[in-house]
Amino acid sequence: MIENNIISDHFTVEGLKKLKITPPDAKMYKKILSNWDSVAKPLDGMGDFELLTAKIGAVLGDENIDISKKAVIMMCADNGVVAEGISQSGQDVTLAVAKSMARKASSVGRMAMTTGADTIPVDIGINSDESVKGLLQRKVRMGTRNFAKEPAMTKAETLEAIAAGIKIVRGCKADGYRIIAVSYTHLTLPTIA
């Protein structure tokens, strides 16, 4: 799947600034809402569902919304700031959760299964060299550094991590995915946020 879809872009700060994301199609958004208004129901009777479908259609640029092929990309990494004692558990939990994701046994995996979405767990920086079947290997480094003492990542590592995410999404698009959700696992989100 994604492993076979190699994209050889070399990312730089300047290159990232030049990336263009097509904005949602405002006319399509209005058209889809108008289509809902022609359905036999009270005006806005479907509530937020009408707005959600209009947003999806505007992003896809198509009023015939097809999200039959969907994925959840789950990025897994450890953060060095855990050394400050700010987490109730150690970094070994990240690896355990990633293994659970690879088996589709995590909460995200189970929710994805109920919607028919594929799951793509990614090791972007787990502090372990263990190879896990079903876990896409895109490791930038073995966990970040402790940002309480030094920068968590170098500029080059940051660019590599961003590039990895872009390449995974491009691979999904090339594989026919119509909608992608993202998730993550690490133990220190409240601290790094």
Regions found by a protein language model. Give the residues of each.
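An N-cap/entry alpha-helix motif that binds or orients negatively charged groups
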Residues: K27-N64
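Generic N-terminal amphipathic, Lys/Arg-enriched alpha-helix
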Residues: I7-P23, K27-A40
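Conserved small/polar residues in nucleotide/adenosyl-binding loops
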Residues: T185-T191
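Active-site cofactor/substrate anionic-group-binding motifs, chiefly glycine-
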Residues: D66-K69, I73-I126
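Solvent-exposed alpha-helices and their adjacent loops that cap or buttress functional pockets
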Residues: L60-S68, A112, G171-D175
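Gly-rich Lys/Arg/Thr-decorated short loops/hinges at beta-loop-alpha junctions or inter-strand turns
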Residues: N35-D37, S89-D92, K139-M153
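Glycine-rich, mobile lid/loop segments that gate access to catalytic sites or pores
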Residues: G143, E150-Y184
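A structural motif shared across PLP-dependent enzymes of the aminotransferase-like
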Residues: S128-Q137
